[in-house]
């Protein structure tokens, strides 16, 4: 199958680019070597914490630790100086949880005597003994994407069923090593049922969780009795029970994924019944249960993701029935409520951070700005990215702020963090410096309807675009045809067929135009595999520049020219 990939122009180049990145380690602009372990970021505007108004200071880093923050530091001769005069320094972001760099374990084979009503734990998705450490790859392109977005620490979740395993906390630093701060941190849990076997329903998942928890409590009692009393039969402990002991003894929390109001209620009900430590994660729809969350005392990690507004933009204003109008109103109300939920958590005084699971790194900053535009304060947004998750994860002594003795995790941006034109120029993770290209942006920005501010000219997106993508191995390209149907963008894209037989075509999915930025996805099938390719670029007149990204392979520059504008629908 590798030969088949390498026959293809675009996919072959992507694979070549992927392989060239496998030795990636960045502390100089080329990312190939670390030239020093001592850095001085001089005269930057430093925000030490979410409540800090910011002031000019120098940050001195040595061996991955912040050794000083101030205005009168003595810099060692070996320090590499990063001029920070026009830069703004913030603590590196912390993902309360995520799946970056995590691979899926192999499915267990069903035994010949398999009984669907009583399957083995591993087949039923009950694998609390698994550790995220064993499935993490530091060199994954997902890790780089999130680091580029400003994230320097993440708790990672193992993939799997209702009890997939134990989480780990790691630093997104040296790509050549797995930089774990803590292992076996918490038990990941969710309401994911099993297909074709017990537990096959949400109620069944709850019952099974109780069963596993209570049987482990009985085993602990049995072990205590065996240790203190003669004549007692030796307890037989299963791998599941052994892994659950720390949870039952309240040494480890349960990190429960609960996206909906119903799942949140169920997770809190289980916690009240059984008494384990609870952290709620993956929250999406929670406006109606905020009081319940607050009364439970559980910290929360909300999804760093907002609903797509396409359904709102596609609503028609003419020729629709009253029932349809009412439905439109309900959809719009639900959408607007979702945008305000984070602000409601802040108002309620609930400690919350962010979960990056299922979110896109490229959309993080726009998501944060949208939350702020809908009532979340900038201070609370920064706290949810730094000090709050540090507290929730129990790592506030080493991360979350820019102070002497903390891990050297920080971002350097071109302006204050939540301004529209702000970009991240450097990320320091575990003392490793990662440099990123700063793109020049026009002062005239686009609006949601494709109009340019201060101008009556519309951004032209419909038509045929000829594109090329550059990778370390060369270039490849094709045509992008964009059409608009009832206000919704769509179309097709051509690319080099992985089979080596000329060009192939695929429909464009999830297309959107935000300001001047056009983004969309398409699927490439080859050798039984399906790859999701994301293209995102900024349009200026009849040209577009951006990136073509493929999970596990990386991101590559892409350029396009509009050759046939205003294609008729």
Across the structure, where does each feature detected by a protein language model lie?
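Histidine-rich, glycine-flanked metal-binding segment
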Residues: 28-32, 37, 46, 50-92, ...
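His/Asp/Glu-enriched, well-ordered alpha-helical/loop segment
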Residues: 43, 105-106, 112-121, 253, ...
